[in-house]
Design a protein with these regions (language model features):
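Active-site loop immediately N-terminal to the catalytic Tyr-X3-Lys motif
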Residues: 21-27
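SDR active-site lid
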Residues: 49-117
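Non-catalytic terminal and boundary segments that flank Rossmann-like NAD(P)-dependent oxidoreductase
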Residues: 92, 139-163
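Residue(s) in the substrate-gating loop at a strand-loop-helix junction
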Residues: 16
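Amphipathic alpha-helical dimer-interface segment in Rossmann-like NAD(P)H-dependent oxidoreductases
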Residues: 1-9, 45
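Short-chain dehydrogenase/reductase
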Residues: 92, 119-129
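Active-site helix of classical SDR
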Residues: 32
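Active-site-adjacent segment of SDR/Rossmann-fold oxidoreductases
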Residues: 21, 42-53
Length: 163
């Protein structure tokens, strides 16, 4: 942190679409990305007082070797075969992948920015997905507002709590 502070620097954290929501067959992957983003949000709040910016980069699909040579898998379980087939079809039919150099150009623009955002989505598909997930969450929260608010009551803290 002191080295970053003296330069009024920034930290760029790679994340992924997996941090936007939990998707079938990606639970452990998504959990790691949720953790990375929570840690990065906390770091951003801590580092802001020192003039240090933190950005979480959330890329969509890019033509890399991730899904061919870059991924280790285990023997599929028969019970998951229909779900796996459905997901493979979705990826084949609707996957929007792009050239990695376009992501690199966006990250360079980010690095050169005087006011980088906490989060940067890379790609149209992930941009749309992020908004869809956010709208769904907002609608759910709004639908359960009364129940949510009823679960809290202003009262004095029990003995032993607080200062």
């Amino acid at each position: 942190m002191p080295a970053l502070e003296s330069d009024r620097s920034a930290s760029t954290r790679p994340s992924s679409i997996g941090a936007l929501g939990g998707f079938p067959l990606t639970g452990m992957y998504s959990a790691s990305k949720f953790a990375l983003e929570g840690m990065s949000e906390a770091l951003a709040a801590e580092a802001a007082r020192f003039g240090i910016k933190v950005t979480i980069v959330e890329p969509g699909g890019y033509w890399t070797g991730l899904y061919t040579t870059g991924m280790a898998t285990t023997e599929p379980m028969d019970a998951y075969a229909p779900l796996r087939a459905e997901l493979e079809k979705q990826f084949a039919d609707g996957s929007v992948d792009s050239m990695p150099h376009l992501a690199a150009e966006a990250v360079m623009k980010l690095v050169d920015s005087d006011d980088p955002p906490l989060r940067l989505l890379l790609g149209s598909a992930i941009y749309d997905l992020a908004f869809d997930i956010s709208r769904q969450r907002m609608a759910t929260w709004a639908g359960w507002e009364e129940t949510s608010r009823a679960a809290e009551q202003a009262t004095e803290a029990p003995e032993g709590y607080g200062a």
